[in-house]
UniProtKB/Swiss-Prot annotation:
Family per record: Belongs to the ClpX chaperone family. HslU subfamily.
GO molecular function terms noted in the UniProt entry: ATP binding; ATP hydrolysis activity; peptidase activity; proteasome-activating activity
Principal location listed in the UniProt entry: cytoplasm
SMART domains reported for this sequence: AAA, ClpB_D2-small
UniProt KW keywords: ATP-binding, Chaperone, Cytoplasm, Nucleotide-binding
Name the UniProt record assigns to this protein: ATP-dependent protease ATPase subunit HslU
One GO term describing the cellular component: HslUV protease complex
Residues involved in ATP binding: I18, G60, V61, G62, K63, T64, E65, D248, E313, R385
NCBIfam families per UniProt: hslU, PRK05201.1
Entry keyword Cytoplasm: yes
Organism: Rhizobium meliloti (strain 1021)
Length: 435
């Protein structure tokens, strides 16, 4: 768990997301409170619950990106799910407890990668020995092995083809799940794990070059050095204490007064979410997982429904509300120029690979922002995603002809932008008259 201060968290988020200070402050405080909770004694720590957040704002203004960057910053298990993908228990579809199972799987991957990094040096040594075994055999004299080891380290044997044994992907299969009881499994029937341990696991022969074999063998050797049970325990603890769940499109399961039909199932999904958000225990194949301290961030545009249309009990479990504002022309301009991996920087780097130097004038950036604002106002407001449509249209010719223009420079000005997006604006005007 990172110990960034709220100010440092907001500063880090500012590198990738423009504006939305209220939302950034809310998630920064929530993350810092997790660190504060870890400093408490055990008795009080269990009593401190996370303050779940409800983000309200149109699409494309940064709701998902704020949550994703927050999880990356914290090094925490993170899952993003659409609330509309789930159905009430008893209906065909995924049940909400699958969210927690997915979170634990993400935790397993995070912990495994972390542990692999710790044993990488030892795994690399073991991988080198296996490459030497494949090159000279296991019975070669020490002098021969040392001679080949020097050549190996000097990259003289990189292109030589060898055959190595590696563990089959997925050979330590999970237990059989009981129909109708997701997450529960029958330990007695976990045959692949039993036989895998008894027989040393299933392997397959792979033909590859010496250079490419290292990636396979280092992973293989790393997994041999890891304790799977320890990884599972750590992953469950990480999911329980540091997990972040982003519930998108929560407004789509809000039932308006007088609604019938699908509203019944939507209300059922809300009722199924209640215990998950409040705190319950979910059965997974890695053991029971408590959701008491998982941070839930719900979001929705709420164009039709209102936050008050959610079940009162669910509203009470989302105590912190932040509204994200729609993006202005100045915001679009800053998105194009100030963010860490801005679109302009991305396109410049992509075309540099073809030897084309791309340059945008200040008035071109203004024109791009202006067009994006107009299209959002006239068609559908999709926020910052509109910039991708505009940029693709403006740079269509340059991207297509780039292989033939190596060594040349291309300057994009306001006139160039208007010339290339004029038909886009014309199509927009016509679209208003199409049913």
């Amino acid at each position: 768990m990172s110990n960034f201060s709220p100010r440092e968290i907001v500063s880090e988020l500012d590198r990738y997301i423009i504006g939305q200070k209220d939302a950034k402050r809310a998630v920064a405080i929530a993350l810092r409170n997790r660190w504060r909770r870890q400093q408490l004694d055990d008795e009080l720590r269990d009593e401190v619950m996370p303050k779940n957040i409800l983000m309200i704002g149109p699409t494309g203004v940064g709701k998902t990106e704020i949550s994703r960057r927050l999880a990356k910053l914290a090094g925490a298990p993170f899952v993003k799910v659409e609330a509309t993908k789930f159905t009430e228990v008893g209906y065909v579809g995924r049940d909400v407890e699958q969210i927690v199972r997915d979170l634990v799987e993400v935790g397993i991957s995070l912990v495994r990668e972390k542990r692999r990094a710790e044993v990488k040096a030892k795994a690399h040594q073991n991988a080198e020995e296996r490459v030497l075994d494949a090159l000279v055999g296991t019975t070669a004299s020490p002098a021969t092995r040392d001679s080949f080891r020097k050549k190996l380290r000097a990259n003289e044997l990189d292109d030589k083809e060898i055959e190595v044994d590696v563990a089959e992907a997925g050979s330590p299969g999970g237990a059989f799940e009981i129909p109708g009881m997701p997450g529960a499994n029958i330990g007695v029937l976990n045959l692949s794990e039993m036989f895998g341990k008894a027989l040393g696991g299933r392997t397959k022969k792979v033909k590859t070059t010496v250079k490419d074999s290292y990636a396979l063998l280092v992973n293989d050797e790393s997994d041999k050095l890891l304790d799977n049970e320890q990884i599972q325990r750590e992953a469950v603890a990480a999911a329980e204490n540091d997990g972040i769940v982003f519930l998108d499109e929560i407004d789509k399961i809000a039932t308006r007064e007088g609604g019938i039909g699908a509203g019944v199932s939507r209300e059922g999904v809300q009722r199924d979410l209640l215990p998950l958000v409040e705190g319950t225990t979910v059965a997974t194949k890695y053991g029971p997982v408590k959701t008491d301290h998982i941070l839930f961030i719900a979001s929705g545009a709420f164009h039709v429904a209102k936050p008050s249309d959610l079940l009162p009990e669910l509203q009470g479990r989302l105590p912190i509300r932040v509204e994200l504002r729609a993006l202005t022309k100045e915001d679009f301009r800053r998105i194009l120029t100030e963010t860490e991996a801005s679109l302009i920087r991305q396109y410049k780097a992509l075309l540099e690979t073809e030897g084309v130097a791309l340059d945008f004038t200040e008035d071109a950036i203004d024109a791009l922002a202006e067009v994006a604002v107009q299209l959002n106002a006239n068609v559908e407001n999709i926020g910052a995603r509109r910039l991708q449509t505009v940029m693709e249209r403006v740079l269509d010719d340059v991207s297509f002809n780039a292989p033939d223009r190596g060594g040349q420079g291309v300057t994009i000005d306001a006139e160039y932008v208007r010339r290339h997006v004029g038909d886009l604006a014309a199509n927009t005007d016509l679209s208003r008259y199409i049913l």
